[in-house]
Amino acid sequence: MNWRNVAEEISEWIGDYANRNGIRTLVVGVSGGVDSAVTSTLSAMTGIDTMVLNMPIHQDESQFDLSGRHIEWLKTEWGNVSGEVLDLSSTYDEFRSEAGVLSDLSLANSRARLRMTTLYAIAGSNNGIVVGTGN
C-alpha cells in the first residue's frame, strides 16, 4: 500500500467535501497524539484554511509540548494553517465550581466536551467544520 497516495486521496476527499458544501475553514483539535497529528496534516494538505487548536486544561507544559511542536511544523509546511493554544483551565474551573459535586468520570468527560464545544464554536464562527479524529 502506498501511504502517500492514501493520504492524498483522503485529503482530496476532505477538500472536495468542503468545497461542495461551501466550507471555508477546517478546524482540528490537537492533543499531541497520532490521531490528531494525522487528521490535522490531512486537513492542511487540502489547501483550505486550517485552524489547529491546542486546548490544555490544567496540563503541565511538557504534556502539550508535542502538539505545540506539531502546530509549528504544520505552519511552516503549509501556508494555509493557523494555530494557537487556548488554555481552557479557567473555563473548566468555573464550570466545576458552579456544577457542585461531580464524579471523577463525569469530570474527565467534561474536559472532552468543553474542548468539543470550543472547536464547534470556532468552526461555526469561521464558516467551517470540525474535522474529527474518528473514523
Describe each PLM feature range.
Residues 1-135:
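ATP-dependent adenylation/nucleotidyltransferase module used to activate substrates
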